[in-house]
Amino acid sequence: MIDLKQLRENPQAFGDRLRRRGGDFDLDRILELDAQQRQLEQQRSQLQARSNEIGALVGKKIKSGIAPTDPEIQALKAEANALKQKLSDLEPQERQLKEELESLLLTIPNPPSETTPIGRDETDNVEVRRWGEEYKPTYPCQPHWDIGTRLGLWDVERSVKVAQSRFVTLLGLGAALERALIQFMLDSHRERGYVEVLPPLLVNTASLTGTGQLPKFAEESFRCADDDLWLIPTAEVPVTNLYRDEILAADQLPIYHCAYTPCFRREAGSYGKDTRGLIRLHQFNKVELVKFVHPETSAAEHEALVADAEFILQALKLPYRVIELCTGDLGFAAMKCYDLEVWLPAAGCYREISSCSNFGDFQARRAKIRFKGAKHKGTQFVHTLNGSGLAVGRTMAAILENYQQPDGTVRVPEVLQPYLKCSHIGGAKS
């Protein structure tokens, strides 16, 4: 959620920064509702103060020996009753204003950071760096969906029978490779200081609202018909909300968590895109990295988060590039974001495999995650960050394509061989 105080104090500058995303946002209506709400709060405060004053005055007069039936006492009590009615009459007005204001605030995205490149869409994103040499074999290069089918790593047709399209059942070494990747990613992140979490796969509406998926992306999520529960689109949601409505001690920060979960997305707007393979599924596995940090270290923690995701790609020796998203391509809740894109030789292009976002205090305001330190009076909102470390299915796709051999086998990356107990998939060595 945006900082309403910032908008109130400098609406022009705030609006200019927000409009770098593109689109039109009704900030004037928010300011109007905010002013009305503050006016009602002031009115309530004045009425309550007078009510308290009358209560004290009546008590003092009765204590001095004046009878409760005295006309002066009766007049004060009548005024007190009138004030009580006025306070009661304010409640529905305040409630309606609060609901409308909060509803509007939930639709406003996070303003981009000052260092985010300005642009309209993904064509204006900025390449930051590349790692590794693009694999371009001299022999015919198969796409991962053909490799996986040929080697018996999954069964798509039966998955459609069991569920529908965009689901896959992994088999044999396909299932083993997926499991090996998950374990390797978790082991690596734990060694780098992350505390592993195994969270619920179903969350309530408040959790999805806290991280920014609701109300904007309700159509992208799977919802249980009879309960206030949703299947998670990413582990970011349950892990971030572990600390919802909490005040942390400053010395608890930073908090680093890693989590493996299946993720579920309807992909409502992707009809006809990536219909084959592991790139775009309704259910997929992902290892997520989530950080809760002090605002002063937020930018440095973001760069470190990107490095942690890059570590997995480098350990697997998969070529990739780092892209900084422009203002027009930022996710709803992010103020700054880097995408890691892995090289897929069959397609001859890079595809996103991790998105590492700094949300500033945007999610923390929605989820009410604060901290209290000795140097500051009151509480402050933490900064939250998260990134994929990595999307497991897309990592498998990249391995199958980048490690395919002329004899039709797939060489297993060295770091995964202890997990799989083999050096190749397919052929005599598997």
From Swiss-Prot:
Catalytic reactions on record: tRNA(Ser) + L-serine + ATP = L-seryl-tRNA(Ser) + AMP + diphosphate + H(+); tRNA(Sec) + L-serine + ATP = L-seryl-tRNA(Sec) + AMP + diphosphate + H(+)
Protein name: Serine--tRNA ligase
Function in brief: Catalyzes the attachment of serine to tRNA(Ser). Is also able to aminoacylate tRNA(Sec) with serine, to form the misacylated tRNA L-seryl-tRNA(Sec), which will be further converted into selenocysteinyl-tRNA(Sec).
Chief place where the protein resides: cytoplasm
One GO MF term: serine-tRNA ligase activity
Gene name for this UniProt entry: serS
GO biological process terms held by the UniProt record: selenocysteine biosynthetic process; seryl-tRNA aminoacylation
Family that this chain belongs to: Belongs to the class-II aminoacyl-tRNA synthetase family. Type-1 seryl-tRNA synthetase subfamily.
Catalytic activity, EC: 6.1.1.11
Coiled coil: none
Binding site for L-serine: T234, A235, E236, E288, S388
Subunit structure: Homodimer. The tRNA molecule binds across the dimer.
Top EC group: ligase
Compartmental location: Cytoplasm
Binding residues annotated for ATP, in chain numbering: R265, R266, E267, E352, I353, S354, S355
CDD domains in the record: SerRS_core
Keywords: Aminoacyl-tRNA synthetase, ATP-binding, Cytoplasm, Ligase, Nucleotide-binding, Protein biosynthesis
InterPro entries from the UniProt entry: aa-tRNA-synt_IIb, aa-tRNA-synth_II, aa-tRNA-synth_II/BPL/LPL, Ser-tRNA-ligase_type_1, Ser-tRNA-synth_1_N, SerRS_1_N_sf, SerRS_core, tRNA-bd_arm
Written domain comment of the UniProt record: Consists of two distinct domains, a catalytic core and a N-terminal extension that is involved in tRNA binding.
